[in-house]
């Protein structure tokens, strides 16, 4: 079983740690300020996400079909919702500082350009 872990390092790079290749993180993208992932749970035998929860709400030992929005089973995950913010490497591109509320709820006032990308992806092997 291979595990692929994506995370943002302290150096603002998005990394991939792939256990099937090596235990050395591979940098993928520079200047990533934030990455958020939530899991879409299909409740009561439905095939679409009824709610989205963070990994902290997932319970490894929970039986399939018993998920709630406060405690989910990994086997009930049918989609993921992701959101990440990237910024320019030059922090002086804009003529004046712009107030920007990032994904983590922090106000940023430097002169860098930023873009937030978000989306939902269905896990096809989970939907009938």
Predicted regions and their residues:
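Short linear sequence signals and composition-biased patches located at protein termini or domain-edge surfaces
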Residues: 1-2, 7-128
């Amino acid at each position: 079983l291979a595990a692929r872990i994506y995370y943002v390092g302290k150096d603002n790079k998005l990394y991939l740690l792939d256990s099937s290749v090596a235990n050395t993180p591979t940098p993928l993208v520079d200047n990533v300020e934030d990455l958020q992932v939530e899991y879409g749970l299909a409740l009561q035998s439905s095939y679409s996400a009824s709610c989205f929860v963070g990994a902290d709400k997932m319970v490894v030992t929970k039986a399939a079909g018993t998920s709630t929005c406060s405690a989910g089973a990994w086997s009930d995950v049918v989609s993921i919702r992701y959101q990440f913010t990237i910024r320019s490497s030059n922090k002086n591109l804009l003529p004046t500082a712009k107030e920007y509320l990032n994904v983590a709820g922090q106000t940023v006032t430097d002169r860098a350009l930023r873009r937030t990308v978000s989306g939902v992806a269905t896990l096809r092997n989970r939907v009938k």
